[in-house]
């Protein structure tokens, strides 16, 4: 990342994986209670921010299918501007590589990177807790990226506790299908009563010989998604013939973990040509973690 008084360039908005995802209940307002472990990846969209003196917030990159006014990045910048009353504006460029509807947190991570970067560029110096409170207004996953550490998540995803995870390499395969999260949450066959676990349960398993992402819990959404979307089911089956695999979030991406980059790249090389695969290393901390205190 490059840093100056008038711009911040090459700011990574890291993807996330759900190492497991349990749905433990449903609230009267329709929201679901979840338990999950969020894993940051050293892979994602890249954002560039340039200070404007006229107070305008402008996205200067076209993002197909996402109007500027509804883009979470623009909404995040305007939210921060309104909250603080700053006179500054910003031009935002986005190098978009994460697919939408993939369960990788792309839009949420972009929004969080925007809040963190503008906290620095606009010299606001807001504390992390205040940024997290703003982030909730943008989506349930955004506070995690502001939190900035791998985390055990509960509630609707906003109750976060840091977890230490070993370094791993992941192969992430994304079928050419968009899975609407709301559709999966509303499916009548979705499991909503998984017995709650504790962070101690997860950590004990991680330190055992079997401590691998596929060996704790499950993704409660995976059965519904693979029933509805044959492409996702095909990826899960193909990867399972190579190594244990699991869907992240509400899909459509599926991941497998490896001890080394070489192993992950070797598996990627065997993918069918029509599939989109990426190899990424785990992260322990958001690249912009120090932009909030």
UniProtKB/Swiss-Prot annotation:
InterPro entries: GHMP_kinase_C_dom (IPR013750), GHMP_kinase_C_sf (IPR036554), GHMP_kinase_N_dom (IPR006204), IspE (IPR004424), Ribosomal_Su5_D2-typ_SF (IPR020568), Ribsml_uS5_D2-typ_fold_subgr (IPR014721). Keywords: ATP-binding, Isoprene biosynthesis, Kinase, Nucleotide-binding, Transferase. The gene is ispE. It catalyses: 4-CDP-2-C-methyl-D-erythritol + ATP = 4-CDP-2-C-methyl-D-erythritol 2-phosphate + ADP + H(+). GO terms for biological process: isopentenyl diphosphate biosynthetic process, methylerythritol 4-phosphate pathway; terpenoid biosynthetic process. This is 4-diphosphocytidyl-2-C-methyl-D-erythritol kinase. It is an enzyme of class 2 (transferase). Catalyzes the phosphorylation of the position 2 hydroxy group of 4-diphosphocytidyl-2C-methyl-D-erythritol. It comes from the Bacteria. Pathway: Isoprenoid biosynthesis; isopentenyl diphosphate biosynthesis via DXP pathway; isopentenyl diphosphate from 1-deoxy-D-xylulose 5-phosphate: step 3/6. ATP binds at residues 99-109. The active site is at 16, 141. Its EC number is 2.7.1.148. Belongs to the GHMP kinase family. IspE subfamily. It holds the Pfam family GHMP_kinases_C. GO terms for molecular function: 4-(cytidine 5'-diphospho)-2-C-methyl-D-erythritol kinase activity; ATP binding. It comes from Burkholderia cenocepacia (strain ATCC BAA-245 / DSM 16553 / LMG 16656 / NCTC 13227 / J2315 / CF5610) (Burkholderia cepacia (strain J2315)).
């Amino acid at each position: 990342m490059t840093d100056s008084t008038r711009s911040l360039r090459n700011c990574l908005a890291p993807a996330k994986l759900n190492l497991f995802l349990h749905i433990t209940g449903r609230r009267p307002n329709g929201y679901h209670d979840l338990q999950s472990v969020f894993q940051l990846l050293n892979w994602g969209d890249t954002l560039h921010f340039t200070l404007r003196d006229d107070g305008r917030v402008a996205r200067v990159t076209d993002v197909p299918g996402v109007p500027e006014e509804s883009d979470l990045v623009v909404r995040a910048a305007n939210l921060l501007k309104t909250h603080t009353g700053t006179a500054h504006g910003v031009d935002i460029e986005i190098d978009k590589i994460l697919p939408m509807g993939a369960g990788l947190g792309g839009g949420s991570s972009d929004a969080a990177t925007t809040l963190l970067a503008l906290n620095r560029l606009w010299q606001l110096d807001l504390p992390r807790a205040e940024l997290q409170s703003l982030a909730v207004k943008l989506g349930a996953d955004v506070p995690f990226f502001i939190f900035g550490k791998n985390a055990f998540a509960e509630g609707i995803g906003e109750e976060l506790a840091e977890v230490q995870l070993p370094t791993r390499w992941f192969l992430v395969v994304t079928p050419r299908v968009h899975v609407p999260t709301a559709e999966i949450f509303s499916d009548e066959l979705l499991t909503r009563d998984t017995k709650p676990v504790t962070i101690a349960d997860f950590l004990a398993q991680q330190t055992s010989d079997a401590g691998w992402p596929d060996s704790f819990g499950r993704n409660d959404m995976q059965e519904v998604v693979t029933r509805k979307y044959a492409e996702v089911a095909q990826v899960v089956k193909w990867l399972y013939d190579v190594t244990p695999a699991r869907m992240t979030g509400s899909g459509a991406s599926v991941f497998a973990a490896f001890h080394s980059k070489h192993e992950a790249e070797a598996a990627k090389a065997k993918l069918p040509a029509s599939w989109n695969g990426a190899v990424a290393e785990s992260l322990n901390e958001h690249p912009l973690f120090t932009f909030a205190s």
